[in-house]
A protein has these predicted regions:
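Flexible, glycine/charged-enriched surface loops at secondary-structure junctions
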Residues: 20, 41-44, 107-108, 124
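Catalytic phosphate/nucleotide-handling subdomain of diverse soluble enzymes
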Residues: 8-14, 27-33, 75, 80-151
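Short, surface-exposed, polar/charged, turn-prone segments marking secondary-structure boundaries
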Residues: 19, 55-58, 137
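Inter-helical turn/loop segments and adjacent helix faces that build the functional surface
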Residues: 1-19, 35-43
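Small-residue-rich helix-loop
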Residues: 25, 29-32, 36, 40-68
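Acidic-glycine-rich active-site phosphate/pyrophosphate-binding loop
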Residues: 1-7, 47-60, 80-92
Length: 151
């Protein structure tokens, strides 16, 4: 986990060099690490709340009515993590994140990264998405997948 948090800090400093931006990146990276290493949603939630101080007690139904486009980590990362925590599978995670409104592409990107680590991506969805890639992008994706499989 220490290496995950260190790398999250280093990568966040390039584009989000603010304490809250770094904290958000580390919280997401920690959730991904925990999901990828077989931890439960309860454990992921507890770790993020304890380590980063995010309040993950509100449900998506409670967030949705008042949520709007916000460009701060403290009002994006917890909501994205909550969408993952409430989900039942990868697609449900993305749909839940988008349903919150606001900066929905960012929410879905964050939620999706955690959901991929926890659930994996359904093969039919992978195939459908791959149909839309150029050969060059397909080659890059394959290289990234191969690199991850070696870890």
């Amino acid at each position: 986990m220490a290496e995950t948090l260190r790398l999250a800090r280093l990568t966040a400093q390039v584009t989000h060099d603010h304490p809250e931006g770094i904290k958000g990146a580390q919280a997401v990276a920690a959730a991904i690490f925990l999901a990828r290493t077989g931890h439960s949603k309860v454990e992921i939630k507890a770790y993020v709340e304890c380590k980063f101080g995010y309040d993950l007690s509100r449900t998506c139904d409670e967030i949705r009515p008042t949520y709007h486009h916000v460009e701060s980590c403290q009002e994006t990362v917890p909501q994205a993590i909550t969408a993952f925590l409430e989900s039942t599978d990868f697609e449900d995670a993305l749909r839940t994140a988008v349903s919150l409104g606001g900066d929905s592409d960012t929410l879905a990107a964050i939620t999706g990264s955690i959901a991929e680590a926890f659930y994996g991506v359904p093969e039919n969805l992978k195939q459908e998405c791959r149909k839309r890639l150029t050969p060059e992008l397909e080659e890059i994706l394959q290289a990234c997948e191969n690199m991850l499989l070696q870890r």
